[in-house]
């Protein structure tokens, strides 16, 4: 079991401060959720950063990271730590530190998430579509980014926003396309399009 904070270390009061994480909470969780083990997210971190942490969990699940996944260190500098982790379904690369946003690991890696001092990349051989905003309830309109994680340079994305299954004749988008999701209920479905074949459709439910 792995964790970055719990009730024994969290800040409680000025007279009972304990040993909390005082900054870079999301970067710490990004590292935790990319590494082997059985990660446990602190409830208060989840409540404060639900969408971001849920997306990290979805990347972990998509690549099949598990308790015995192999880790390969790619950078171990004072301002950047990066490692690739091999899951049962693909490889996830996590970068953390002040230089994480600028890290460019190579053409076989596709960036799928980024934030303050962290970034997630997935190896392109996984051949899957990706949407960076997790399913959930949001108080306002949102913007999502669609990404084609593929080693085929001709790969595109097809999508629907009414819950129907996308086909080769559905709306198409290139990797990196952004969509505006209106306030209210939207069921977004996205598939990877290579030639005339749509595969690995994913669903996001927004309310």
Regions found by a protein language model. Give the residues of each.
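Carbohydrate-interacting/catalytic domains
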Residues: 1-132
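Short, compositionally stereotyped local motifs that mark structural "simplifiers"
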Residues: 125-207
């Amino acid at each position: 079991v792995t964790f970055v904070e719990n009730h024994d270390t969290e800040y409680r009061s000025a007279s009972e401060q304990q040993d909390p994480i005082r900054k870079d909470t999301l970067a710490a969780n990004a590292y935790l959720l990319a590494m082997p083990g059985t990660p446990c997210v602190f409830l208060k971190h989840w409540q404060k950063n639900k969408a971001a942490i849920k997306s990290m969990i979805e990347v972990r699940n998509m690549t099949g990271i598990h308790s015995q996944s192999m880790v390969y260190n790619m950078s171990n500098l004072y301002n950047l730590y990066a490692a690739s982790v091999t899951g049962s379904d693909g490889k996830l690369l996590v970068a953390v530190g002040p230089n994480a946003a600028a890290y460019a690991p190579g053409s076989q890696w596709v960036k799928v998430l980024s934030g303050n001092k962290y970034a997630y990349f997935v190896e392109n051989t996984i051949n899957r579509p990706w949407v960076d905003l997790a399913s959930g309830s949001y108080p306002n309109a949102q913007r999502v980014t669609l990404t084609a994680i593929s080693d085929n340079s001709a790969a595109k994305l097809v999508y629907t926003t009414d819950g129907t299954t996308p086909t080769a004749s559905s709306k198409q988008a290139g990797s990196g396309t952004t969509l505006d999701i209106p306030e209210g209920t939207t069921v977004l479905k996205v598939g990877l399009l290579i030639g005339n074949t749509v595969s690995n459709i994913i669903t996001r439910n927004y309310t």
